């Protein structure tokens, strides 16, 4: 059976909490769009986690977590989250990242804060 959690608003709807509850029995959990500006807090046996990039499925050994091609992937945020789950000894992380993601790096977020666009040269 396929289950989808889709927001009808701009956030703060409880999607992360519902996704975490469903992830306990899921084979695959996919984050299909969005950026690191949104997030959800997960509290479990490993500790308290604020996830902005990783799907909730990372805490379940039977679940594959997928970061899909609609995600604006903030690399420093992803690395921080990966380091946090490793440091808290979350076992058996199965994570797949689409090769079609838009990768954001530090210079992208800095230019956005300054109100400037980044362009290729």
Can you annotate each of these PLM segments?
Residues 1-121:
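Non-transmembrane, aqueous-exposed alpha-helical and coiled segments at domain scale
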